[in-house]
Amino acid sequence: MLLTPGEEPTALPDPVVPARASSRATPKATASALRRVLRRARDGVALNIDEAAVAMTARGDDLADLCASAARVRDAGLQSAGRRGPGGGLPITYSRKVFIPVTHLCRDNCHYCTFVTVPGKLRARGAGLYLEPDEILDIARRGGELGCKEALFTLGDRPEDRWPEAREWLEARGYDSTLSYVRAMAIRVLEETGLLPHLNPGVMSWSEMARLKPVAPSMGMMLETTSRRLFETKGLAHYGSPDKDPAVRLRTLTDAGRLSIPFTTGLLVGIGETPAERADTLHAIRKSHKEFGHVQEVIVQNFRAKEHTAMAAVPDAGIEDYLATVAVARLVLGPGMRIQAPPNLVSRDECRALIAAGVDDWGGVSPLTPDHVNPERPWPALDELAAVTAESGYELVQRLTAQPKYVQAGAAWIDPRVSGHVRALADPVTGLARDVNPVGLPWQEPDDVGSSGRVDLNAAIDTQGRNSETCSDIDSAFGDWESIRAHVHELAAQGARAPERLDSDVLAALRSAERDPAGCTDSEYLSLATADGPALEAVAALADSLRRDTVGDDVTFVVNRNINFTNICYTGCRFCAFAQRKGDADAYSLSTEEVADRAWEAHVAGATEVCMQGGIDPELPVTGYADLVRAVKARVPSMHVHAFSPMEIANGVTKSGLSIREWLISLREAGLDTIPGTAAEILDDEVRWVLTKGKLPTSLWIEIVTTAHEVGLRSSSTMMYGHVDNPRHWVGHLNVLRDIQDRTGGFTEFVPLPFVHQSSPLYLAGAARPGPTHRDNRAVHALARIMLHGRISQIQTSWVKLGVQRTQVMLNGGANDLGGTLMEETISRMAGSEHGSAKTVAELTAIAEGIGRPARQRTTDYTPLAA
């Protein structure tokens, strides 16, 4: 067994990628099938999985034909990208690196690996369990003196989960995990040597990668194979290695894309996989990269058997098999992908053959450190590698650890905290490496965000409107729209498979809800959610009756002010028209002084609450959120600060290094009173990952909100609907909220948020509905009242999104609260809402009186106002 008794693998709670087929049959590679595939390759047609598997069987003249097609694709890609070496030739790139083996311990047991060992063997040879900081820095410094610019951090997966000695080593030095140690050492390498960390710690969760992104321009993890057969079958390469589950590795690859991390991945050739499984692996990488654009290079690595391993007797990958796989990788992944092959695992002549097969990158090559994964295979000397490359008609050109297009894209891909280190080493024109040695630079949080951009947007949005229809990079910021639309079609097909609801179903569900509103089955709730006509009237009447019994006839509201302190954001929420990139015509950031000024203005106008939310600006300093709270409390001590969505909290936690609980307590101590339960959208990841590229997963939203409640920070709860969702998702979302409320009791209200579509990128791309119908609005508000009965008493309706008349309809169908006066509102208005951004107390009172109900001002948490 890999784990010590009583231990379990570290949980990775983020969304799980559906498992692929356990194995894939290799199509019969007849001569005619191969001829057809080779013809398609010559024509530049992308090969599907079966065609790719057939192509991998090419040998002799057929292999030469295949490689020639791949080389043409590679050259066309380099030419179209304008990539040239200093001498004007097409480049083949490499990264001059040092290899830093942080630890040789691992919780896995891959049958071909000599990198990993056990604590006893390390002790026997006098080696530490981990490299000490001084050892890491010594390697980096010596590499810098030789012109190295990359520090490759390689290590085993989560050794502390298997080895108590590893956990003791970390705890003795103040680290709670290996990844925390890696992060700290990456910062020291940046500050003390200037080398750029490339982090290769294996499988990571969304949260872990978000934590590491600020300390490394790039990361990597070999996918290796999508073959479940190799993972599940005793005696095969990945059996007994929990981190080699293909679904888990695909999840890491996907989450890296969601976080916009330049990411290196690849496959191993010759570990027992079939050509069809190899082709499936390439297509899995292709699919992920197509959706997110984050795979910066794909390593095609040939298996080399090593002594003293379980696979010592397995033959090395054959060179023709290897070349065919490289060529197919180029043809499948296309002209824009960097295809990499390690030059130390082949001979000089084979290096030339790899170039002929479509390779355009040699990966990291070190003049100082060995390849600790393949220690028996020394790196070629750089002048020798340059000569081999030149013999094939190409120039050897040094790059940085992040490929040039990601370096040149800036903040969309490179975190501001390492961007200065990258700029110091990058050619500003090409994004390749400059001919300089690295020098240590401070790794620090950005300075306090000052006032910039269109700071009057809160007022001008109602008079002048937007200066631009969308953010500047709508074509690239949200991933591949074709892939997104495919996901939407899958969701629509699932909705279409829902059983037809008959009037008798709704009637039976109504009778059940009348007896026990909170005790119906999901099927009954779904019947209520899909009701229409007279049946919908009956559902709304039941909801209105429950509202009256629960909270009475008063229509409540809070006098508050929205303060959206910045709209600069790179998260990539596809539904959001508020987010802008720095420098966009409508982008802005408020200083803490301006936020405090607006809080004072709100106080003078009678407000008891400010609601502060903003975009996820990577330049917001680590103290930024607390600074905003303190500024408001210093100016208006009595003001209730309702601020920061779970996404903002996740961002703050990532920046700070604190746990969620510690960060929330620190904000509470700074003066934070409650948090908005926004950033929920739909709490179902199959919908969530269509709506957003990089927002926190459902599991983390739940953890943050639950923890907030536990430390005394109550929250609202929300659901945004009417985009790519269906009633089944509404029921599921409300069930999640019910479960949290049962455990914490921390929700103050529920707020249904109709999707405002007009300027939403998701809608403009043809992937979303034009918002909910009036039937949907009525059904959601009524369903919420019924399902949340006895748990959440306050159901709010949004006059900003619905307008006065439809707001009144919702108040007669289960809702009892109008939200707030707002004073300013830019998120819905930038999306295209036409119902204004502020209401006076008199106007909100008129909404209630228009349906014969009294209006009453409340506090944020619905306690009575002080006299």
From Swiss-Prot:
Gene: fbiC
NCBIfam families found in the cross-reference section: CofH family radical SAM protein, F420_cofG, F420_cofH, PRK06245.1, PRK07360.1, PRK09234.1
UniProt-recorded Gene Ontology molecular function terms: 4 iron, 4 sulfur cluster binding; 5-amino-6-(D-ribitylamino)uracil--L-tyrosine 4-hydroxyphenyl transferase activity; 7,8-didemethyl-8-hydroxy-5-deazariboflavin synthase activity; metal ion binding
Cofactor entry: [4Fe-4S] cluster
Chain positions covered by the region annotation CofH-like: 532-865
Function: Catalyzes the radical-mediated synthesis of 7,8-didemethyl-8-hydroxy-5-deazariboflavin (FO) from 5-amino-6-(D-ribitylamino)uracil and L-tyrosine.
EC nos: 4.3.1.32, 2.5.1.147
Protein name as catalogued: FO synthase
Domain Radical SAM core: 92-344, 555-796
Region annotation (Disordered) ranges: 1-28
HAMAP family: FO_synth_sub1, FO_synth_sub2
Binding-site residues, [4Fe-4S] cluster 2: C569, C573, C576
InterPro entries the record matches: Aldolase_TIM (IPR013785), CofG_family (IPR019939), CofH/MnqC-like_C (IPR045567), CofH_family (IPR019940), Elp3/MiaA/NifB-like_rSAM (IPR006638), F420 (IPR034405), FO_synthase_su2 (IPR020050), rSAM (IPR007197)
Catalytic activity: 5-amino-6-(D-ribitylamino)uracil + L-tyrosine + S-adenosyl-L-methionine = 5-amino-5-(4-hydroxybenzyl)-6-(D-ribitylimino)-5,6-dihydrouracil + 2-iminoacetate + 5'-deoxyadenosine + L-methionine + H(+); 5-amino-5-(4-hydroxybenzyl)-6-(D-ribitylimino)-5,6-dihydrouracil + S-adenosyl-L-methionine = 7,8-didemethyl-8-hydroxy-5-deazariboflavin + 5'-deoxyadenosine + L-methionine + NH4(+) + H(+)
Record-stated family: In the N-terminal section; belongs to the radical SAM superfamily. CofG family.
The record's free-text note on cofactor binding: Binds 2 [4Fe-4S] clusters. The clusters are coordinated with 3 cysteines and an exchangeable S-adenosyl-L-methionine.
Alphabetically ordered keywords of this record: 4Fe-4S, Iron, Iron-sulfur, Lyase, Metal-binding, S-adenosyl-L-methionine, Transferase
Binding positions for [4Fe-4S] cluster 1 per the UniProt entry: C106, C110, C113
Record keyword ATP-binding present: no
Pathway recorded for this protein: Cofactor biosynthesis; coenzyme F0 biosynthesis
Region annotation (CofG-like) ranges: 93-425
